[in-house]
């Protein structure tokens, strides 16, 4: 009975290793274009697969390895190789030249299945800091100024960030320094001095006696109540103004109170003037003085009988036929003349003619 199967299945060792070899060859070109310090060691350490060939197959069959176990082991190796290739590609496109993200020994141990050296992996920031320094050195060249070397001794790992932050703080400090003279130039308001009750009492007592003090009197009063002459002078000025304002407010209040009792009564209207209207005819008879109301001088006298005016008698003479030898006719003529004269005189006065 032969140990090798008659018909090969797709799960044989050669079928599994052939795509891995193609993948390795494909990424081999990328590794050849990688930096010198990264390509060869990483490529050698990343791929640790057993050699493929008839001898390896025979050894596997002789050892009694079943196809599923072999497939699982080689799948792990393939996954490790793919991860290493992806890391190499990422390092090629994202990392500066000459910088390796992981040590080759640690990567080799990981690909071989050992996890004991994972603690030896350096921090990511250390690699980035070293890469940035290497890139800066390659781009700008080494700086020989001794001042920069002395400064670099005092700068910590996060020097770039701190310098940026200190730049903003420096700007704020400069602005504060520029504003400082403005605040110093502004005049400061003096603190208000509070007098004691004894001092106020003495000042008020002296103010009642004398509202204006001379310089010697002011100095003497200030020495008595333990104040400065300037304070006494200012207090007297303020108190004089206060008294004047209080007097003015009091006078205005009194006027308001007096006006609140009631408005003053309006002056009585002037009495209508009595104008004497002359009455020419009263009870059908003309008046003598032409006034209907007696004058003050005539108040106690009896009104006299009206007599016909001579001019009216001349205007209305009695007819000649009536003047005869008979006395009765003469009396009648006289009476008729009197009555007719009175009526005629009234008609003439009112502008009517009969």
Swiss-Prot record:
CDD domains: homeodomain. In the embryo it is detected in the posterior hypothalamus and later in the head. In the adult it is detected only in testis. Its main location: nucleus. One of its GO terms (molecular function) is DNA-binding transcription factor activity, RNA polymerase II-specific. Residues 290-304 have a biased composition (Low complexity). Residues 245-329 are annotated as: Disordered. Keywords: Developmental protein, DNA-binding, Homeobox, Nucleus. Residues 262-272 have a biased composition (Pro residues). Pfam families: Homeodomain. Gene3D superfamilies: Homeodomain-like (1.10.10.60). One of its GO terms (cellular component) is nucleus. It is found in: Nucleus. Residues 188-247 bind DNA. Probable transcription factor. Belongs to the NK-2 homeobox family. This is Homeobox protein Nkx-2.4. The gene is Nkx2-4.
């Amino acid at each position: 009975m032969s140990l090798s199967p008659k018909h090969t299945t797709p799960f044989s060792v050669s079928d599994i290793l052939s795509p891995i070899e193609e993948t390795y060859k494909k990424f081999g070109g990328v590794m050849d274009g990688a930096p010198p310090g990264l390509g060869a060691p990483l490529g050698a350490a990343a791929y640790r697969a057993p050699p493929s060939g008839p001898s390896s197959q025979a050894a596997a069959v002789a050892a009694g390895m079943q196809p599923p176990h072999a497939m699982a082991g080689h799948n792990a190796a393939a996954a490790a190789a793919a991860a290493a290739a992806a890391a190499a590609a990422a390092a090629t496109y994202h990392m500066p030249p000459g910088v390796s993200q992981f040590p080759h020994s640690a990567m080799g141990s990981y690909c071989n299945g050992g996890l004991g050296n994972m603690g030896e992996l350096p921090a990511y920031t250390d690699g980035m800091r070293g890469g940035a320094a290497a890139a800066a050195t390659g781009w700008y060249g080494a700086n020989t100024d001794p001042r920069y070397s002395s400064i670099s001794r005092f700068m910590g790992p996060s020097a770039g960030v701190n310098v940026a932050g200190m730049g903003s703080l420096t700007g704020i400090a400069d602005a504060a320094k520029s504003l400082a003279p403005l605040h110093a130039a502004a005049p400061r308001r003096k603190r208000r001095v509070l007098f004691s009750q004894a001092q106020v009492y003495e000042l008020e007592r002296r103010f009642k006696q004398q509202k204006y003090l001379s310089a010697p009197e002011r100095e003497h009063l200030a020495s008595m109540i333990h104040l400065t002459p300037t304070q006494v002078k200012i207090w007297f000025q303020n108190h004089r103004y206060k008294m004047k304002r209080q007097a003015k407010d009091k006078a205005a209040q009194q006027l308001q109170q007096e006006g609140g009792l009631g408005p003053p009564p309006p002056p009585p209207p002037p009495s209508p003037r009595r104008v004497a209207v002359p009455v020419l005819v009263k009870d059908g008879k003309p008046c003598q003085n032409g006034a209907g109301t007696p004058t003050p001088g005539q108040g106690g006298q009896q009104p006299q009988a009206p007599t016909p005016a001579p001019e009216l008698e001349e205007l209305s003479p009695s007819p000649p036929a009536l003047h005869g030898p008979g006395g009765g006719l003469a009396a009648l003529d006289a009476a008729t003349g009197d009555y007719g004269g009175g009526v005629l005189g009234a008609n003439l006065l009112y502008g009517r003619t009969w």
